[in-house]
């Protein structure tokens, strides 16, 4: 029913130099995008891997499956970015709430490329 940043998504959807693929688990009658698993759009996705970046935001368990699909499309690991959404309490790395492995999302992230993330224990 509600999608965050809907206005921005609509703006991106109409750009000629940008392709946006959105999917939701369960859609209502107002949704005009994909419905199902987040990996579903990869079934019909045709891309140029040398001109493609992937940006992931969601639960960490999802990242493993989406990265597998991106790799099937030959998207290089260094072009896959993921956001580690953690509760950032202090914002300066003192409280440890946002710590993932040896990294602090408030200082070192929250966005990491795959090469950085794969070595962070507990990230995916």
Language-model segment annotations:
Residues 1-89:
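FNR/FR-type flavoprotein reductase catalytic core
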Residues 21, 50, 92, 106-107, ...:
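Short linear functional motifs in flexible/disordered or boundary regions
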Residues 34, 80, 102, 108, ...:
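Glycine-rich, flexible loop/turn motifs
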Residues 61, 85-110:
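Local cysteine-cluster metal-coordination motifs and their immediate loop/turn environment
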Residues 71, 104-106, 122:
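Alpha-helix termini
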Residues 111-124:
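Short microdomains enriched in Cys/His and/or Lys/Arg
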